[in-house]
Regions:
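Residues forming the flavin
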Residues: 1-64, 104-272
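Rossmann-like flavin
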Residues: 66-67, 71-126
Length: 272
């Protein structure tokens, strides 16, 4: 049996890991527009092994109360079980698992109650520099298990009738064709246009996501230290029912050391 996975982000990599951990005997091929963790440039923050998370600061915020709609399709308990498996894999390939930190707030502190709510769930931090080593260890494990990677290749069509994935190299005039018995579609942000193309071509049902507008706010860390001591990546929120909108904080970057440039559709933005 041939399994083809489109996308080497967290979804695709964990899918391949699940297969090999369960002694899958067929062929596994992962196709991605980026590169492996040894050769992926820091400028490519979206594509390559582990996807957008590969060049992040190493925070893991997997919970049904924030982002995503996985629980809608498989239920709350199953979603949390899958999230735990992902977190376990990041710890499993960590070169020094004892260094993994977790902040798990148990109650909202009184000093914010008049103003905001605080999401109560654990946030794991594997370490910014360690994250690169995790990626290498994880990649080596999959390669040792026989997983094949096709890098710098953009999938431009999927022939469902004949079970073919059609791609083209981004570095040369090379066209690829991979036949599959099972297909896992795991593209992320950099493949969203292709996902939309497939949905329109095959009349797949879709639903719009809510619009989120982000504002970067910087302030001295001491202003937030009491919150940071409770939750490293604190998630404050407030709903304005009369206006039909809500406000939340996300991806706090305490005592930041790195800033990465992100190139999307010709625009350049940055992350702390």
């Amino acid at each position: 049996m041939n399994v083809v996975i489109v996308g080497a982000g967290v979804a695709g990599v964990n899918a391949a890991t699940k297969l090999v951990d369960n002694n899958f005997k067929g062929k596994i091929t992962i196709i991605d527009m980026g590169l492996d963790p040894y050769n992926r440039p820091t400028s490519d923050v979206m594509r390559g092994f582990l996807g957008a998370g590969g060049w992040s600061d190493g925070k893991l915020t997997y919970h049904t109360s924030i982002g995503g709609q996985l629980s809608k399709y498989c239920g709350e308990d199953k979603a949390m079980e899958l999230f735990d498996q992902v977190i376990d894999n990041f710890k499993r390939f960590h070169p020094n698992p004892s260094e993994v930190q977790c902040s798990d707030p148990q109650a909202e502190p009184d000093f914010i109650k008049p103003h905001f709510g605080l999401r109560l769930f654990p946030v794991w931090h594997v370490g910014t520099d360690y994250l690169h080593e995790i990626g290498k260890n994880w990649y080596d494990y999959l390669v040792d298990k026989g997983v094949e990677f096709v890098w710098e290749t953009k999938v431009h069509a999927i022939d469902f009738e004949n079970c073919r994935v059609l791609g083209k190299s981004l570095v040369g005039d090379i066209h690829t064709e991979d036949r599959y018995d099972k297909l896992i579609f795991g593209v992320g942000k950099s493949g969203i246009d292709f996902g939309k193309q497939l949905a329109e071509e095959y009349n797949l049902p879709t639903e719009p996501k809510s619009v989120q507008i982000g504002v970067r706010f910087e302030a001295p860390q001491q202003h937030f230290q009491k919150l940071i001591d409770i939750s490293y990546d604190f998630k404050l929120y407030q709903k304005f029912e009369d206006k039909g909108v809500s406000l939340r904080t996300f991806c706090t970057n305490n005592n930041a050391a790195y800033v990465a440039a992100e190139h999307t559709y010709g625009d350049v933005s940055y992350n702390g």
